[in-house]
A protein has these predicted regions:
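S-adenosylmethionine
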Residues: 1-117
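Intrinsically disordered, low-complexity coil segments
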Residues: 8-11, 159-160, 218, 266-274
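Generic detection of long, well-ordered alpha-helical segments
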Residues: 12, 142, 274-278
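Residues that form generic nucleotide/phosphate-binding pockets
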Residues: 87, 133-136, 249, 262
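Rossmann-like AdoMet/SAM-dependent catalytic core
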Residues: 92-245
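Long, charge-rich, low-complexity alpha-helical segments
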Residues: 152, 232-298
């Protein structure tokens, strides 16, 4: 069962933004029994983080966001996504980003050193604590520990929430905060748009996006087209020629539907293929907008 939220001095209060670096380190009791003292600023993350996340619904105003750092276990053959998804409160959007994955030995060694226990200073104590930590992980079939961000958002109006739990290890240039805020805003807007409304959008290509083409010598058409993001999360997207064409003319003047019609006419597509092309561009527009490659324009 999910642990209840811990008592909080902010009980009954709501906020527009919550930022938290809670004690999230997964330090097993056996480690402290082996001689490593509890460090209040970081330890006991196992039961604390799920409770904090579960209680966010009581503290977020409509349109508000909570951002947390956290760890979660990768157990057995199960998915870490299922573990973290079980923490999330109903009715709220959630974007969970796993930024790094460490194996148990790496994880335990890092936090033992952070606590001042190193093999150079006290090899016997270090080995005992490391063994206790690894024994606990093995007993619970923990095969890795993920590090990342938990971003939880209350919709401005009641609607079906969206959930995205993904592994993204790349990074773009600059700070991440504005990118996160834009993604949440775009997703809020797209949640109320059907495909016809998305086709009417006039998107703008983000200024940090570049295109990379791979061609076999002598070939007229590229074998691979990549769109690369310089900011945000530094994502790379493999694009079809149609999606690359959309990105190439996304200057805020033409709608997605107009671009689809123009490409279909130039390619002399029949009605069925033209409809499929339009659907592809609409779907791609949603993805490019929610990852920051495109801005909504109108």
């Amino acid at each position: 069962p999910r642990p209840p939220p811990p008592p909080a001095p902010v009980a009954g209060r709501r906020f527009d933004l919550i930022a938290s670096n809670p004690p999230f380190v997964l330090t097993p009791p056996a480690v402290r029994e082996a001689g490593l003292p509890l460090m209040e600023y970081r330890d006991a993350g196992g039961p604390i983080l799920p409770g904090l996340v579960a209680g966010l619904a009581e503290h977020l105003e409509p349109g508000a966001t909570a951002v947390m750092l956290g760890n979660w276990e990768h157990r057995g053959t199960g998915s870490w996504r299922d573990t973290v998804a079980a923490w999330l409160p109903e009715g709220l959007d959630a974007w969970i980003l796993e930024r790094e994955l460490q194996d148990p030995v790496e994880y335990a060694t890092m936090w033992l050193r952070d606590g001042g226990l190193t093999p150079e200073r006290d090899p016997e104590a270090f080995d005992a604590a490391l063994e206790a930590w690894i024994d606990d992980f093995e007993a619970r079939d923990v095969r890795g520990v993920g590090f990342g961000y938990l971003i939880v958002h209350r919709p401005r109006r009641p609607r079906e929430p969206w959930r995205l739990l993904e592994e993204v290890t790349t990074s773009g240039q600059g700070v991440l905060g504005p990118h996160v805020a834009e993604v949440l805003e775009v997703r809020e807007r797209l949640a109320g748009l059907d495909d016809a409304a998305v086709a009417d959008l006039r998107p703008l290509l983000a200024p940090d996006v570049t295109e990379e083409r791979h061609l076999i010598p002598g070939a007229a058409e590229p074998t691979v087209i990549l769109l690369r993001q310089g900011g945000g999360l530094g994502r790379t997207l493999q694009a079809s020629t149609a999606v690359a064409a959309l990105a190439g003319v996304a200057d805020g003047e033409l709608s997605v539907g107009q671009v689809a019609s123009a490409v279909a006419a130039l390619s002399e597509l029949n009605a069925a293929d033209a409809a499929a092309l339009r659907a592809e561009m609409v779907e791609a527009t949603r993805h490019l907008l929610t990852t920051g490659f495109l801005h909504p324009g109108n």
